[in-house]
Curated annotation (Swiss-Prot):
This is Uncharacterized protein YmdA. To the N-terminal of the FimA/PapA family of fimbria proteins. The gene is ymdA. Induction: Under control of the CsgD transcription factor, part of the csgBAC/ymdA operon. Residues 1-22 form the signal peptide. Keywords: Signal. The keyword Signal applies. One of its GO terms (biological process) is single-species biofilm formation.
Length: 103
């Protein structure tokens, strides 16, 4: 009674690696990009607080300033910017990475 179960378990374990490999095999593919970048990215000045962002928009470059509190909360109102996230790299909050996602 126990032996048939053991045999089926051993047989199943032999085929398991092949099933896992077959699922991750990629035969190839092509990614097509259609469109264009119509305006350059925002120029961000982080030399002082508040942070100044100059975002080209329809030929002009309007500047806006944001406090570090607004950036940390993600409360940035700009037509071109979807979100701004700031992550500090040290406990003293002297080094940070700012991730800007555009619309």
């Amino acid at each position: 009674m126990f032996r048939p179960f053991l045999n089926s378990l051993m047989l199943g374990s032999l085929f398991f690696p092949f099933i896992a490999i077959a699922g991750s095999t990629v035969q190839g593919g092509v990614i097509h990009f259609y469109g264009q970048i119509v305006e350059p990215a925002c120029d961000v000045s982080t030399q002082s607080s508040p942070v100044e962002m100059n975002c080209p928009q329809n030929g002009s470059i309007p500047g806006k300033t944001y406090s570090s509190k607004a950036l940390m909360s993600g409360n940035v109102k700009n037509a071109q910017i979807a979100s701004v996230k700031v992550q500090y790299l040290d406990k003293q909050k002297k080094l940070a990475v700012m991730n800007i996602e555009y619309n």
